UniProtKB/Swiss-Prot annotation:
<dbReference type="InterPro" id="IPR037198">
    <property type="entry name" value="MutL_C_sf"/>
</dbReference>
<dbReference type="GO" id="GO:0016887">
    <property type="term" value="F:ATP hydrolysis activity"/>
</dbReference>
<dbReference type="GO" id="GO:0140664">
    <property type="term" value="F:ATP-dependent DNA damage sensor activity"/>
</dbReference>
<dbReference type="InterPro" id="IPR036890">
    <property type="entry name" value="HATPase_C_sf"/>
</dbReference>
<dbReference type="GO" id="GO:0030983">
    <property type="term" value="F:mismatched DNA binding"/>
</dbReference>
<dbReference type="GO" id="GO:0005524">
    <property type="term" value="F:ATP binding"/>
</dbReference>
<protein>
    <recommendedName>
        <fullName>DNA mismatch repair protein MutL</fullName>
    </recommendedName>
</protein>
<dbReference type="InterPro" id="IPR014790">
    <property type="entry name" value="MutL_C"/>
</dbReference>
<dbReference type="InterPro" id="IPR002099">
    <property type="entry name" value="MutL/Mlh/PMS"/>
</dbReference>
<keyword id="KW-0227">DNA damage</keyword>
<dbReference type="InterPro" id="IPR020568">
    <property type="entry name" value="Ribosomal_Su5_D2-typ_SF"/>
</dbReference>
<dbReference type="InterPro" id="IPR014762">
    <property type="entry name" value="DNA_mismatch_repair_CS"/>
</dbReference>
<dbReference type="InterPro" id="IPR042121">
    <property type="entry name" value="MutL_C_regsub"/>
</dbReference>
<dbReference type="GO" id="GO:0006298">
    <property type="term" value="P:mismatch repair"/>
</dbReference>
<dbReference type="Pfam" id="PF13589">
    <property type="entry name" value="HATPase_c_3"/>
</dbReference>
<dbReference type="InterPro" id="IPR042120">
    <property type="entry name" value="MutL_C_dimsub"/>
</dbReference>
<dbReference type="Pfam" id="PF08676">
    <property type="entry name" value="MutL_C"/>
</dbReference>
């Protein structure tokens, strides 16, 4: 007796449906994709019990014709592709022809649609079988009503979460579609109550309405870049804002939400010099790429994508973010977001509609812009005045530490640490401050313009050395005896191989001498005596951006050379660190950690009830 047999057609469809439809939010995603692909400018969403009981979508798209309606629920029927060539240039959100058939198998679905606006037809399908096809009163667009979800998938239904959790998952899907399609009006109804309306608006305004309350001072920076077949639009929080989780890093490729580790790494890598380890930036990335250079057909829910040239894209994103925060702020427009919402969950906040708002013309109203653009000028030398607050100054006593003293001398006598000040700095200009003293052998206390600064001595010295290293003139130093090293991790080996030519631009010459084996032949003069540090960088390489390696290398050298906690500093050297701190306008150490804490005279008076 044969053990291998053909599966029943209905069973095959149930298995296929289980792969793409795992919970109500999956159904919602597929239906929204269809509405968006239909060219709809208005989409109404009705959810009951987190989508478990009912999902109803109404759109004003081009609709489905009578004959197409009869077959639209069958497996692998689609209007979006017709040949293998079409797979290479997909521009629609859906394309496989699986969505409606999978939904029809695991629920009861009713579709009413019209292409003319004069007459419409309705088809009702239960368990993948047509039950009714009839003429209906005229509508403009399509209505899809899904009920009894997973009634014939008892195991799947048993593992659904409680209503609030399923609702939250559906709202996340809605958020993804709302943010990527600002040209569409969305109306959201939960359990037969109107919850939120998003009007047609610009992408900037849509980001405001969806994410505007994420950062306290409501300021986003907008970075736009174009390169051949790639268009980048980034919404970045100011450098002093970060989160403990990655959930506020969101990436969208051709209007699809993508969970791609490489894109996440590119964004975090670009922020690595301003955000401390363990924290993550607030960033929303929108990529538009020629469809011929990407492949979305790699994940059942299209959450991943293959890029034609991922290393280049990684570098483009990372370097542009890095350069963005390096440049003067007056080179960019700062978008000021006015906080409108007070509820943590924007999507479920009740909307306060004007009394005269007519439901029939809601979508003809375009919301007033709530963004204003400010051009902020980075004035590096204003308000530098000395004030005496009467605190007792004391002179720090340097202990008898010859090796430490010698280290300080070497740092600032080496020629490669000399660098020119930026042209807009006045070298003769004296930075006025009142040095109070050193506390806990760790912090320097300074008074300047009615403010008190507590400065981390190690971090500020580390940053000063780091900046001198970055701006120094470098020369190539050939090693008398090349240093051999091994790369064990295959992924790291691939990264090193792809970047060997780039290392040459940094005056770092390495050669591959066998499988997983390399030798270091030349290094920049500033890396002298730090060859082992460089080898460690190669062996633990995770980033694809050369600038990151260079920055991390300099940060490591600076960390080794900088003064440490418990080092007692002389008065002269302390003043030097403070002068450089104000002159370079230092805010973060090379690892992204904050260098100082500041409190104003007014705040201090408030603490002691004098204000």
């Amino acid at each position: 007796m044969n053990k291998i047999r053909f599966l029943d057609k209905y069973l095959v469809q149930k298995i296929a449906a289980g792969e793409s439809i795992d919970r109500p939010c999956s159904i919602l995603r597929e239906l929204l994709d269809n509405s968006i692909d239909s060219g709809a400018t208005k989409i109404e969403v009705f959810l009951e019990e987190g989508g478990i009981h009912k999902i109803l979508i109404i759109d004003n798209g081009i609709g489905i014709g009578k004959e197409d309606l009869k077959i639209c629920y069958l497996p692998h029927t689609t209007s979006k592709i017709s040949s293998e060539e079409d797979l290479r240039k997909i521009e629609t959100l859906g394309f496989r022809g699986e969505a409606l058939s999978s939904i029809a198998i695991c629920s009861n679905i009713s579709i009413t649609s019209s292409t003319t606006g004069n007459e419409s037809y309705q088809i009702e399908v239960e368990n993948g079988i047509e039950k009714c096809f009839k003429k209906q009163p005229a509508i403009n667009g399509t209505i899809v009503n899904v009920t009894k979800i997973f009634h014939n998938f008892p195991a799947r239904k048993r593992f659904l979460k409680q209503e609030p959790i399923e609702t939250k998952m559906c709202l996340k899907v809605l958020e993804e579609k709302i943010i990527t399609h600002p040209e569409i009006n969305f109306e959201i109804n939960l359990n037969q109550k109107l919850r939120k309306i998003y009007f047609k608006e610009s992408l900037i305004d849509r980001v405001q309405n969806v994410y505007g309350n994420v950062i306290e001072n409501n300021k986003f920076k907008v970075l736009k870049k174009e390169h051949e077949n790639i268009k980048i639009e980034l919404f970045l929080a100011p450098a002093n804002f970060s989160k403990k989780s990655k959930r506020h890093i969101k990436t969208f490729v051709n209007r699809r939400p993508i969970d791609q580790k490489d894109l996440l790494e590119a964004i975090t890598n670009g922020h690595s010099r301003i955000i401390s380890p363990g924290n993550f930036p607030i960033c929303y990335l929108f990529l538009e790429i020629n469809p011929e250079y990407i492949d979305f057909n790699v994940h059942p829910q299209k959450k991943e994508v293959r890029f034609f040239n991922l290393p280049f894209l990684f570098k483009l994103i990372s370097d542009n973010i890095n350069n963005f925060f390096d440049k003067d702020i007056n080179s960019y427009n700062e978008i000021v977001i006015k906080r409108q919402l007070t509820d943590d969950d924007n999507l479920i906040e009740m909307i306060n509609q004007p009394k005269n708002l007519n439901k029939t013309n809601t979508y003809d109203i375009i919301q007033n812009k709530n963004l204003e653009t400010e051009h902020t000028v980075n004035d590096l030398s204003k308000n530098i005045i000395q004030n005496d607050i009467g605190l007792r100054r004391y002179n720090s006593i340097i202990q008898n530490r010859p090796s430490f003293k010698e280290n300080i001398t070497n740092i600032f006598s080496d020629k490669f640490l000399e660098f020119e000040e930026p042209p807009n700095k006045n070298e003769k200009e004296e930075i006025k401050f009142n040095y109070i003293g050193q506390i806990f052998s760790e912090f320097l206390i300074v008074e300047k313009v009615n403010e008190i600064y507590f400065i981390d001595q190690h971090a500020v010295h580390e940053k000063i050395i780091y900046e001198k290293l970055r701006n120094s003139k470098k020369t190539v130093q050939k090693l008398l005896i090349p240093i051999e090293f091994t790369i064990v991790d295959k992924n790291i080996e691939e990264i090193i191989d792809s970047e060997i030519e780039e290392y040459k631009k940094m005056d770092i010459i390495i050669s591959k001498i066998g499988p997983k084996k390399y030798q270091l032949e030349s290094i920049p003069n500033i890396c002298n005596q730090y060859e082992n540090t460089l080898i460690n960088f190669f062996q633990s390489r995770k980033s694809r951006t050369i600038n990151s390696l260079e920055s991390d290398l300099y940060a490591n050298i600076a960390c080794r050379k900088a003064v440490k906690t418990n080092d007692i500093l002389s008065l002269e050297f302390s003043k030097f660190l403070i002068d450089e701190f104000f002159k370079l306008e230092i805010k973060h150490c090379p690892h992204g950690r904050k260098i100082y804490y500041k409190i104003s005279k007014f705040e201090l008076e408030k603490k002691v009830a004098r204000a």
